[in-house]
Regions:
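One-carbon transfer enzymes
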Residues: 1-200
């Protein structure tokens, strides 16, 4: 999330107002980061809800109360119910630490992704920014960035490099493209419109 805050601060995310951070974990460090940046914080504590449906409903209610136009999953590893996905169709951006469709879907999150990447001996990994759907890591792909795997990589060193070289770059860029209304969704494909230059 810090990459989004920094990119917004330095004007790299255009036409966007970081209106709120909603955390499902009252102990999340993201809360402190958001407060330090002056971003309003709301907690919808997942642990107090009996099931996914009730948690999803509470989260949807909060998003609608705040009149959010875009939702970004930043470190959010929980598959939400269909009611929120449908209400925000093509308006939820997720970042995944692999080149989808490889090493993605149920069970592939956090360090597990990088462990699987190394176990399979692939030479290149990376990150994918995509629209979230009801199926994990299956939505239209907005941006991808490759990261070379080094001989001495461990899951942790690879995780760090994928974050620094890919995730922290393409997630703010995907948000900016959305806010500039430059994304055209055509089925499973996302096309990016050319940037309009006022000075030309």
């Amino acid at each position: 999330m810090q990459a989004i805050i920094d990119a917004n601060l330095f004007g790299e995310i255009k036409n966007c107002d970081l209106a709120a951070v909603i955390s499902s974990n009252p102990e999340a460090y993201a809360i402190e980061r958001a407060q330090y940046a002056g971003i309003p914080v709301y907690v919808v504590d997942r642990s107090i809800f009996p099931n996914r449906l009730s948690f999803t409903k509470a989260l949807l209610d909060k998003l609608q109360d705040l009149e959010m136009e875009l939702v970004v999953y930043a470190g959010f590893n929980y598959i939400l119910g269909s009611q929120l996905i449908k209400a925000y169709e093509n308006r939820i951006i997720n970042i995944h630490p692999s080149l989808i469709p490889s090493f993605c879907g149920p069970g592939y999150y956090g360090l597990r992704v990088h462990e699987a990447v190394l176990a399979h001996g692939v030479k290149v990994t990376g990150a994918t920014a995509h629209f979230a759907t009801e199926i994990a890591d299956n939505g239209p792909i907005i941006l991808q960035k490759a990261v070379e795997i080094l001989e001495d990589d461990t899951p942790r060193t690879l995780q760090r490099r994928v974050m620094e070289q890919a995730e922290w770059k393409i997630l703010p860029e995907a948000i900016s493209l959305f806010c500039e209304r430059r994304l055209i969704i055509d089925g499973r494909r996302v096309r990016i419109k050319e940037e309009f230059n006022d000075e030309s």
